[in-house]
Amino acid sequence: MPFSNYIYEYYDGISSGNITVGKWVRLLYEYIVKGLQEGLFTFNAKKANKAIRFIENFCHHCEGRTDLLKLELWQKAAVSVMFGIVEEDGTRVFREVFIVIGRKNGKTLFASAVIAYMAYLDGEYGAKIYCLAPKLEQANIVYDNFYQMIKKEPELSDLSKKRRSDIYIEESNTAIKP
């Protein structure tokens, strides 16, 4: 399967006017694409597409029919930025990501899928992943959604243990907390 660079594909859509985004998103992708072209950033398509494939093959909707997720182009581009843009030693350049998404557009589901990838396949032993929000109740929504998501996938569920204060993955010594 050939690797795609969804960052360029998304940026091309923005540049051509086929995809409408705000000023800050346009500037961000201009910066990223320029950085890739000038060698400021290194793009590892294998890492980016590994994250995308994981999300689309192991992460389920938690309500309704519980189908597997199918990421939209902007989500694939965002995941590519998060996991595919790396330093020469392979560490991620963007370690913190701020994404603004309108109401009822899948923020919780997308965040849960990214958490799932980081917890199960990112390769960081002893990771501590926190669901943060202005209120604990909001953080618990993402945490609970993540838990429901992994319960739908036996391969992930078998590796996980729900404890009183977290979800623990013994194989990687990883804990996910609200």
Annotate each PLM feature:
Residues M1-P178:
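Phosphate/NTP-binding elements of NTP-utilizing enzymes
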